[in-house]
Structures are given as structure tokens and as C-alpha cells.
């Protein structure tokens, strides 16, 4: 496999991990029927806020479903610890002066050159003396392989004790990182890797001889302090991956800070996060002293290419009839329909299936592998309608999605408009430079108020659509 895309190849390697049998979000089993509708045994009424996906599962889902490199045209912003020092970037791996075995491992994985963000990040991560780094890197930019390369570069194989420590929010994400280490380090057979995760039992008093330890914060903290399997004073590189996921998990933030405080002052600290909201930034500053900072400026999602409409209804059945009228009047390549609860989504998927539509259902009670399979089938066009809750409002790029329907408008836990979710939902259409269409179902004074506030927030007019008038529906498709 030869490719110019370092990050794409990394992600293909990561997505190739098959040992995902433990990725249960809930114990409940969900199976698609012959029509592609996924029917659940129990559909408890859950609010959108409760349905918002656990970040760790979402991160893992992104790794499994991504078949293309995230658009890498965005600008990289570099803030150096010492603004007077020269800013180095590289266009080839040879410039990094890697150990021959590591360079061989990089090429064996199919990489020809660094991606845009690594051009700046790798020289900092491999510099002497070591430099600390905080990097914003969304899923798909190849950051896992970048920090793996940094760890492997620092290890002295002859020293039989842990020298690099990597924290991941979950066992499954730690496993993804471990696979990349094994692949990149395969020409370094003397390099050893250990997983500090719950269930990995060691004898009390035992010392670990592996060079790199990957694990979850709670277990790593136990291994460093209570059980003393690891001598934290000998750690050279400390990586904190998925920081935004980490701080969303109760206890992980405090545990990570406690681990960091045990490390020597000259330990290299590397922190990665997909987002840089205030809570993540405060956390990063606590664990990474005197950092260089790299931010990948993200393309703003826009509503400019999306025509927005609303339909007035009095009940759930009227909303369904309006939906049927839209389908009867215009040709829809593929559509995504968002619901407020799992119960509504399950009902709607079944009703659409009865009408002869090829329907798939996606919700948070499914295991991650099932979700990835449903999304892939939708991407391939095997189902034309995807009914979902907020579980996949982000990150799914399907070129054929021409219509997004908000069967229920997105609100937060206090009943206020969730403008960000609205943007991400209808942003699934109008992509790749094409015109998109968004239809919002309004069934009460409250939801009309929500719609008006969304309209004011984005300063974009949302037109009324009469779905009883077929001529009017036909016009919106032009």
C-alpha cells in the first residue's frame, strides 16, 4: 500500500483493528430486519440530551467509519514556546533523522510523506532537548502515528523498564493506539508494549519491564502509586490522548493530573484534543507546562448552500403524513431524519418501512460496530433513508444526502434551542459544493418558538412549506 497520505494510511491501519467484541454501550441487542430497519426490544423514552453520544464511543466510531482523510486544506497555526526560536517544518521523513528501523516501519505502513499537521508537529516532538506540545487535531489527521513515532524515538531498548506512558480514555481506544505501535515498531522486535487496563492482573510487587505502557487513567494511577508496577520518575514521554474525551469522563481529569505530578520535570508532555473549549484548555495548561501549541483551523460549517423550510403540524401522525407528501412529490437520493427520542426514531423507521422505503435506524443503544456497519450501508446506498437521534449528527459525509429532516427540533436539557446541533444536523446536506435542503417539523407553539430562535441565531430565513400543496413541494426541489 503506497500512498502520499500519511494520515489516511494511519487511519486505515487503525480501522483494521478487528478485536472490537467488547465495545458494548448498552447490553441491549439490536438487529436490522429484512427491510434494514433496526428494531429494538425496548425503546425507553430518552431525551436528546441523554442521547448525546458518549464521547469515547463517538471517537471510536469515527475511527471505524472513516474511509477518507479529513479535509486537510485548513491552516495550521503554530504558537511556539519561544517565539524567537526558528520554526522548523519537514516535507519528508528522512529530514527527521529517525532510527533506520523506525523509518523502515513508517514506510512499511505505506507512508511516503508527513501530512500537513505533522510537517510542523514532528520536528517539535522529536527535538532535542525535548519540547512539550499541546495540539488540536480532529480525528483523521494522523496524530496517533505522530505521537507513536515520538515515543518510539525516545525509547532505549536496552533499558528494561517503562520509558513512555500514554493515557487513553477507554480500553478500546488504548487498543487502537497499541496496534499502531506494534505496526510501526515491527522492525524493532526488542521494543515491548504493556496495557495498563482493568482486568490486566499482575502480581503485587512485580515490576514492569515493557518500554511503553498504554492505559486508562485509573489503572495507570494504581500501577504508578499504590501497586508500584511503574516507576514514574523514569518516564521520558507522557502522552495524553483525546483530552476532550478524557475530561468528559468522571474522575479521569483528576487522575491524569495526579499521574502528571509524579513525573520528572524533564519528562516530555504531549497532549492532543479534537476541540479546544475552555474546559479542555484549562486542563491542558495544568498538565503541560511551557508548551508549544499547534491548532488546526477548522472549516466553518455554513448554511449558505442549504435551503431551509418548516412545516406546521398538529401531531406526530401529521408530521409523518407531511413527510410522505414530500417523498411523493420530489425525488430524494438519500435523506437523514433526526428524532428527539429513540422511541420516536424506532416508530418512524417502522412506519417508513411499511410505506416501502429502504430504511436504516441508528441509535445510542447499538454497539459501536453495529453503528459503523449501518453507516457504511447507508454510505453505499443500500438504504436510502437513515433515521437517527443525535448519535450521528456529526462526522458522516455522504455525498448523496440531498435532504435533512428534523422530525423534532434539537433542544438542550433545559428545553432551549440547541443551535450547534441544528447546524451539525442540517450540515449533513449541502456538502461537497452542492445545494442542500432542510425541512423542520413544527408541532406546537413551543417548537415554533424554538424555530424562531434558531432563525434569529443564524440570521437565516426559514420559509414555511405547505406539504398539502404538491406544486409548492415540487418548487423546493428546483
Curated annotation (Swiss-Prot):
Ranges for region C-terminal lobe: 300-478
One Gene Ontology MF term: ATP binding
Region annotation N-terminal helix: where it falls in the sequence: 54-67
Motif (Q motif): 91-119
Chain segments carrying region N-terminal lobe: 2-299
Alphabetized InterPro entries for the sequence: DEAD/DEAH_box_helicase_dom, Helicase_ATP-bd, Helicase_C-like, P-loop_NTPase, RNA_helicase_DEAD_Q_motif
Gene3D superfamilies tied to this protein: 6.10.250.2170, P-loop containing nucleotide triphosphate hydrolases
Pfam families: DEAD, Helicase_C
Covalent cross-link (Glycyl lysine isopeptide (Lys-Gly) (interchain with G-Cter in SUMO2)), residues: 26
Catalytic reaction list: ATP + H2O = ADP + phosphate + H(+)
Disordered as annotated region, ranges: 31-55
Domain of life from the UniProt record: Eukaryota
Example GO biological process: poly(A)+ mRNA export from nucleus
Compartments where found: Cytoplasm; Nucleus, Nucleoplasm
Primary localization: cytoplasm
Cross-link annotation Glycyl lysine isopeptide (Lys-Gly) (interchain with G-Cter in SUMO1), location: 26
Functional note: ATP-dependent RNA helicase involved in mRNA export from the nucleus. Rather than unwinding RNA duplexes, DDX19 functions as a remodeler of ribonucleoprotein particles, whereby proteins bound to nuclear mRNA are dissociated and replaced by cytoplasmic mRNA binding proteins.
Similarity field: Belongs to the DEAD box helicase family. DDX19/DBP5 subfamily.
Name of the protein described by the UniProt record: ATP-dependent RNA helicase DDX19A
Organism: Bos taurus
